[in-house]
Amino acid sequence: DPRRYGSYATKSYLKVKNEEAYANVFVTHFPDEERTEARPLRTAPCYDRLKALGAVFGQKFGWERANWFAPEGVPQEDHWSFRRSNYFAHIGNEVRNVTENAGLLDMSAVAKARISGPGAEAFLDHLVANKLPKKVGLVALCHALTERGGVHSEFTVQRESVTSFYLVSA
């Protein structure tokens, strides 16, 4: 599906990625495997800081995004597997830490939109299948559906005011 690629997928990028795919035709492909050619392509201002903190990156829509963080003394590299990979326990520790404390997420690579005006709520109510947040400051996970009822998109929707909503979608 060509919609998976944005303006970052230039002819030179596609040439390098095609060559990489051809060179790996007879190589075992693992779940969630990230190929290295033509990377990093797009980086957020915090990329170097995250890398220094142990980030192991993956590419999403041309953007380098931290998939997980290697603790001190652990190599910053993925070891792919059909079972649990080397990062499994580390991600579990990250989730536990964020659940019990707090976390910070680089949102540079995700789509963001503000829908505002007197018809904003009616528009979004028609667009998504879930209930919109009623109180200012509340957040809801909402889904836009296809004509056949499948999920087309997922949004985190925050009500900013009576007539304004902020949407985030990865």
Model-derived regions: residue spans:
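Glycine/proline-enriched, intrinsically flexible loops and inter-domain linkers
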Residues: 2-170
